Amino acid sequence: MSTFVSLGNNKKNFYRLLQFVIKKESVLPKPIYVQKGHTIFSRKGYKTYKFLSTDKFIQFMSASKIIIIHGGAGSIINALNLKKKPIVMARLKKYNEHVNNHQVDLVKLLCSKKKIFIASKYLNIKKVLNKKNKIINKNSFIELSETIRKYI
């Protein structure tokens, strides 16, 4: 069991997602792997990577019990392709994490369809761990892919 965290490749920092992970680290499966992108970060007990090849990225996602990612469509689709339900935090303009808030709509939509968890202080990681984390059957994945495609 492990946790995989991805901040994406945006040049803007995303410390808010890392703060969420740090607050929840006592209940997260170890080891914790972080694809940090351009965000400067290191912490004892975490294995960090600036960037990963697509194959390595998928390998980490596939092997992890918990996936915590930014709200970019590509990362979300990768998790859903693996039939996993990720914990997602949208990058926000007001924190200078992105140029706009386009990730918010996608995250809200997917949460309403119960395909993702939204990263918040109220999220109970122990309950996430106790749920079956493979949530998508083939037909619902096709439907969801069409929804995302229309959105982006």
Predicted ranges, named:
Residues M1-I152:
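Nucleotide-activated sugar donor-binding and catalytic core shared by glycosyltransferases
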